Amino acid sequence: MTGSTLLRAIVAAGVLALTGSLVQAQDKTFKLALQNPKGHPLVTGAEKFAELVAAKSGGKIKVSVFPGGTLGGDAQTVSASQGGTIEFVLLNSGILASQVKDFEVYDFPFMFANAKEADTVVDGPFGQKLHGKLADKGLVGLAYFELGFRNMTNSKRPITTVDDIAGLKLRVIPNAINVDWVKALGANPTPLAFPELYAALEQKAVDGQENPLSVILANKFFEVQKHLALTNHQYNPQSLIFSKKVWDTLSPGDRKILQDAAAEASKFQRQVNRDKAAGDLDQLKKNGMQVTELSAAELAKFRDKMKPVIAKHSEVVGADTVKALEAELSKLRK
């Protein structure tokens, strides 16, 4: 190699190295899609996550939050994340059963008795293992936020017994177990994407729906629903997922920033959600909702009606996953 050839090679190598470092240093902007409107605790948590990412990256990574289903429903945004056009999606973990059947276990009625149980399970080996299964589907599970415990609303009548639910046309999350448990109560399930729900309630296409108090308040369902029954029949963790297609292009340092920010933001969001719950109920009452509760005996009837549904879907989810979750809960309840 001549001196001039060597010099050209050294210069070329230097240019390549510089180009690589510049690409590495380029600012990144990622989109985060979710269904609830601004002001909801999930959006507050997403905004906190964006703040943490910006702080931890020195402003090199920006997360733009798109609330209110503005980028599409959950099915659309998950598909877009797999394709790399939407990087983050924050959604009900049970909806991911369309990708990995094990996630349906999160929609089992009355699975978690309280928030502490839920935290221990989702933050522990069980929850992390389920998130790990998303990689084969083009997604990376980063952390669990929460929607919380679900309650029923309707425009027809107060619910004080399980029999009062029979005959109601209830919107459900579009997956099999939610259809089945509503049928088990003698009601008529209507699967609808969340952005369609308010209009369906307003137009009386459905009689009611079920969601945590925070969702009922933030989406102003009190404008189109008169009756609220505090059933706490299902706890919903929310998965913050990221496009694996994009993840595979990130440096280890950038990945760690996102992982650390997600873990911190998830704990922040859960606490915000829980601190807000009592105030949400008061606000719903002030906005005219009539609130009822089921007695212990009626809740026992509700649980009994869910047993065949849980048995059926345990076969769908798989015995190993169900047994692993039950083992975790058994340890917590000793």
What positions do the PLM features span?
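Cleavable N-terminal signal peptides
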Residues: A12-A13, V23
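Short, flexible helical or helix-coil boundary motifs
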Residues: G14-A17, L332
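N-terminal secretory/targeting leader peptides
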Residues: Q26-E117, P125-Q128, G132-K334
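Bacterial N-terminal signal peptides that target proteins for export
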Residues: M1-V11
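Sec/Tat signal peptide C-region and signal peptidase I cleavage site
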Residues: L18-A25
